[in-house]
Amino acid sequence: MLDNSAFGASSLQEPMSSARWLGQDPDRMPPLPARFLEPSGFVWGKFTAPDGARLRWGHLPAERPRAECVVVGGFTECVEKYFETITDLAARGLSVRCLDWRGQGGSDRPRRWPTRPRPRRFERDADDLAQFTAALPPPGNPRLLIAHSMGGAIALLCLRRFPGLFDAAILSAPMLGIRTGRVPRGVARCITGTARVSGLGLCLIPGAARWRHVRSPSPEVSRISSDPERCRIQYGWFSTRAGLRVDPPTYGWLNEAFRLVARIGRAEFLAGIDIPILLASAGIEQFVEPDAHRRAARLLPNCTLIELPDSKHEPFLEQDAIRNRWFDAIDGFVAQQVAARSGVDHYRP
């Protein structure tokens, strides 16, 4: 287990009001169905990193816990986007803690242009995740890491650097390769690198619009989900709580993302992560590379790949028929980890 003292002083506090943290009206709720809103029993907390940065997190305990998990989202995402998923995980016996990355959700942001993505220091993100997890009470059950997209890439970095912190990991469409559309990947990397060193790192990439110009998505045009309600969750929260908003990628952010995926995609890097991993790969993907998922699944020593050919980028937000297949795989995977901890033989279908 990681010794948190290696990072310096940090602290973990609860409870607090998310809306109060964001300086907004706690009674102003987004126009979303009740299952997408804060679940009963949910508690907010604050984690203070050794450098003083405050990261917001939330906790939903399970009535009869058989495992615990730390959930981290992808680029631009916030805890609120995962309320339904958090509720479903808790109903399955997982005590859930969900963390906002720096610069996203209710965690600390730069004062100037707080919605603008900076060039991310992904090593620091991995440190934040490790420090936060090490500050939690020692687990009596298996501890899992659940991560989506950018969060999945940071998760792999954390798992490689801090072995023993988690017993297993569940990765949803992890950012192991970045789709660049009609622009060849090498050209895109060259452009972002040149823009960064030219002082244009905070400029939005071509075709990206600031959030205020975004309209409510439909399942036909949404790039993350084909579900008519779940595809609007983030828009609902962003339109109601301005403090949660994040703009699209900048040259600086994308340049650092390219560097990260090059690092974590190396065979020797992946070979050093030996805990059980369940990896979901979406078939209708516009953000990350499914081929990179297949390659990683071959190189990781203990990885099960779940391909969802009819899913867009976010399996946790997809239509029930797709989402249920993903949760079926999660149920079986969690049961394996619980059985392994208890020393009971478990049938693997």
Annotate each PLM feature.
Residues 304, 309-349:
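Catalytic active-site module of serine/aspartate enzymes centered on a nucleophile-bearing elbow/loop
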Residues 1-48, 55-60:
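An N-terminal hydrophobic leader/cap segment in hydrolases
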Residues 117-137:
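Alpha/beta-hydrolase active-site loop
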Residues 266, 275, 289-298:
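Short alpha-helix in the alpha/beta-hydrolase fold that links the catalytic acid
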Residues 155-242:
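Alpha/beta-hydrolase-fold enzymes
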Residues 284-288:
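Acidic catalytic loop of the alpha/beta-hydrolase fold
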Residues 79, 86-112:
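Conserved alpha/beta-hydrolase
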